[in-house]
């Protein structure tokens, strides 16, 4: 089949897509998987999902096993930059189209992938931009000094959030006093306590992931540090509650949308409706605009994210379906860019509409 030529594909066409959850039981990763599943359900495709059990090597060995069953395509979550070239080579050898999501390969690796006819593209967000946005909020709130609580060094999202926050905070006249890394979330309380023992007068804590926000709030509250503000990433209902209670100032969210959008990109490719950028290359989408939860909208977001029918449906079935060329002749590279750039505003509108119905 000439995958570069648009085809007329019936709406009930079904594909099997191999994908991976780096580790089940962790909110951000499980939410990634839920967004993929929702997109698959909306588009009528089947997912074959592995649990890598937080082991990078397993993501590759399990991918090999998945490829042996000849899926129609692969949507791969690479938790480390070193995994992408390996996964790409296995997919190429198996002549299986593949898309990357959530975490991004190195630029030089992307240039290599672009020479591979089976490379569909990459759909990510900018964790560096995410961190910068939170830094701007902290500065606007009057913060001059900050400490950062993050996961282990090498974590794709956390490392880039740290860079983005630090650069923006210091460019705005603030100072990041220290960055603390926890080997796993269970160290969050102790590490934050150590931070605030060393820097008891710090203006704010930036917790770089969902699992580090509540521990920071607990420590600040237990130590009676009323002047210390907390900012976070990876919003969830419990963090919404902390914002409503005045224990957290703000938290970013929406990174999971890239997972569902990646499925649509792969399905378009499988349909023969290949999305290319202006240079004729496989697309690298990083325009996803994230939303921010503050005291102004925390209650509405809590209602939305606490509803199982809504929490992982910030993109509707109809929106997923309208990202397929088979359903919408207007879909092209620019359509995807605009869709992702407008994501946050669309979410705000859905959250507000849901609140008004309640």
Model feature map: region roles:
Residues 1-13, 265-358:
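Hinge/cleft segment of the Venus flytrap/periplasmic-binding protein
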Residues 41, 92-93, 170, 244:
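Anion (oxyanion) recognition and catalysis
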Residues 74-96, 165, 177, 181-241, ...:
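Hydrophobic alpha-helical
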């Amino acid at each position: 089949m000439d995958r570069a030529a648009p085809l007329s594909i019936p709406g009930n066409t079904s594909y099997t897509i191999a994908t991976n959850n780096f580790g089940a039981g962790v909110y951000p990763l499980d939410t990634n998987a839920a967004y993929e599943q929702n997109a698959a359900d909306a588009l009528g495709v089947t997912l074959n999902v592995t649990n890598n059990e937080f082991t990078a090597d397993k993501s590759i060995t399990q991918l090999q096993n998945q490829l042996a069953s000849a899926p129609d395509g692969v949507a791969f979550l690479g938790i480390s930059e070193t995994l992408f070239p390996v996964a790409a080579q296995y997919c190429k050898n198996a002549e299986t189209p593949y898309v990357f999501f959530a975490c991004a390969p190195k630029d030089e690796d992307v240039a290599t992938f672009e020479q591979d006819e089976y490379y569909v593209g990459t759909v990510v967000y900018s964790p560096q931009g995410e961190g910068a946005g939170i830094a701007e909020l902290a500065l606007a709130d009057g913060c001059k000094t900050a400490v950062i609580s993050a996961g282990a060094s090498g974590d794709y999202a956390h490392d880039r959030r740290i860079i983005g926050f630090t650069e923006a905070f210091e460019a705005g006249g603030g100072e990041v006093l220290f960055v603390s890394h926890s080997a796993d979330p269970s160290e969050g309380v102790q590490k934050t306590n150590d931070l605030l023992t060393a820097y008891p007068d710090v203006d704010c804590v930036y917790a770089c992931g969902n699992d580090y926000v509540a521990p920071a709030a607990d420590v600040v509250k237990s130590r009676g540090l009323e002047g210390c503000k907390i900012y976070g990433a990876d919003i969830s209902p419990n963090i919404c509650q902390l914002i409503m209670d005045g224990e957290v100032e703000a938290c970013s969210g929406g990174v999971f949308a890239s997972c569902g959008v990646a499925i649509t990109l792969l399905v378009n490719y499988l349909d023969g409706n290949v999305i290319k950028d202006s240079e004729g290359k496989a697309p690298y989408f990083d325009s996803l605009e994230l939303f921010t939860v503050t005291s102004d909208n925390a209650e509405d977001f809590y209602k939305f994210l606490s509803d199982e029918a809504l929490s992982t449906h910030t993109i509707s079935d109809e929106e997923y379906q309208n990202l397929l060329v088979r359903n919408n002749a207007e879909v092209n590279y620019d359509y995807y860019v605009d869709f992702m750039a407008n994501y946050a505003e669309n979410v705000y509108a859905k959250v507000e509409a849901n609140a008004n119905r309640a």
